[in-house]
Amino acid sequence: MRDLVRSGKVFLYGEFIGLLREDHRGFHFSYNPDYQGIPLSLSFPIEQSPFHSDTLFPYFASLVPEGWLKHKYALHQRIDESDMFRFLLNNGENMLGAVQIQEEKQ
């Protein structure tokens, strides 16, 4: 069992909408209670109860680079290529599109 907890603040169009967290039970996404905008995706309808998954949610996993670019990032940043959450935390502020993820320091 891991004691490690990692988390990132999720922004949509620059607005803080929720928190993505990893702990010993898996991955969790919860909306900011004050957020009243559009859902992040169809797989995350607006609701107050958190979403849970044993693995990184497919929506967030799809934001991670693939192939040679993923390999380059891993070498340059000295991270494990299989650690997709670390990729998001390291690069989430510079992703294409409307979503950004900012690592929350513990």
UniProtKB/Swiss-Prot annotation:
Pfam families: Couple_hipA. This is Uncharacterized protein HI_0666. It comes from Haemophilus influenzae (strain ATCC 51907 / DSM 11121 / KW20 / Rd). The lineage of its organism: Bacteria, Pseudomonadati, Pseudomonadota, Gammaproteobacteria, Pasteurellales.
